[in-house]
Amino acid sequence: MAIVAGVDFGTLSVRVSLVDSDKGRLGTASAAYPLHRRREDPDFATQSHADQMAALVQATRAVLAETAVDPAAIVALALDTTGSSVIPVDSQLQPLDDYMLWCDHRAHREAQQITQLAHQEDLEAIAWCGGVYSHEWGFAKLLYWLRHNPDKRGRFATALEHCDMVAATLIGITDPAEVPRSICAMGHKWMWNTRWDGLPPQWFLSKLDPLFDGIRARLGGRYLASDAIAGHLNDHWAGQLGL
């Protein structure tokens, strides 16, 4: 018998299900967190990383109590989150802002500029994301954030997709170079592909905006497929989650 905790971060709540390899799903619990919107700006949608992690603790402890499962029997966490939710962090992987959620659509101009330059330069990557770069995706959101937060640029180290930020937090990673990055999340959303050695070339990113100088290196890490182990739960979060 092996039990896995399936963790699913949605737009308004996180759900934790305990699944037994023999018996199937044993139980599920969820916990909500706030979604920040602005009446004067319908494109604005953000969420706090701290709020999400607090909800994860609440949901995990609730499902453990509901099922009376021995925490020692849980062998793994399988993590799923919303895609296209991006967070900028400092050199210690501490958030510089809230997540720009998938439904945050402020980066229209940046997405149009990426699409235009990609076609102008015959960038192969644009064909792999339908020929149009979306305002929901990573480079557009990050460029918007850098343009609108000049006071935070000096502390900016890298940006992470939602799933990678949660994984790094649970593992206890504080070095951006050690972050496990999901190939699924970084694929068309950040135009990552082994065909062109990962991310788009630095010359393209710098031509898009000098604020992206050096950004390719900043988006380094361990790029992994979804069947890989991102890491191991650290003692702090094992204690917080009751595992």
Whereabouts are the PLM-identified features?
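N-terminal glycine/serine-rich phosphate-binding loop of ATP-dependent small-molecule kinases
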Residues: 1-98, 109, 214-217, 222, ...
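Gly/Ser/Thr-rich active-site cleft segment
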Residues: 9-11, 125-243
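Short, intrinsically disordered/low-complexity patches at protein termini
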Residues: 49-51, 120-121, 177-178
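Hydrophobic or amphipathic alpha-helical targeting/insertion segments
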Residues: 91-97, 101, 113-119, 124
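Carbohydrate-associated surface elements
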Residues: 104
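Hydrophobic packing residues within well-ordered alpha-helices of enzyme cores
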Residues: 111-114, 145
